[in-house]
């Protein structure tokens, strides 16, 4: 988000099984929204004592002023080039990021 943490800030993450992304909403101590960070990942798996997913590097940020920005495409590209993420999975991550970006 590019903002400094302040005492009393709260981050709330909303995980839903099977979704290819999850948002974390950041608020100040007085409840003012400081921004939302949406992580793109493999489908979220929820178990009784843990949550599992693989981060796919690309993310979408909605700043407090309402501007939306897609970030870390370069990290995804680097992961593909290094052989850590297959191209087909990277393409799905890009599609998900684009859909989230449009929805925000």
Model regions and ranges:
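Acidic, polar-rich N-terminal leader regions of halophilic archaeal proteins
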Residues: 1-104
């Amino acid at each position: 988000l590019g903002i400094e943490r302040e005492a009393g800030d709260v981050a709330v993450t909303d995980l839903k099984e099977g979704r290819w992304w999850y948002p974390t909403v950041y608020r100040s101590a007085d409840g003012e929204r400081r921004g939302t960070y949406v992580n793109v990942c493999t489908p979220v798996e929820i178990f009784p004592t843990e949550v599992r997913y693989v981060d796919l590097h690309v993310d979408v940020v909605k700043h407090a002023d309402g501007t939306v920005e897609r970030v870390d495409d370069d990290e995804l590209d680097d992961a593909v080039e290094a052989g850590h993420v297959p191209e087909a999975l990277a393409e799905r991550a890009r599609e998900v990021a684009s859909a989230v970006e449009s929805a925000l």
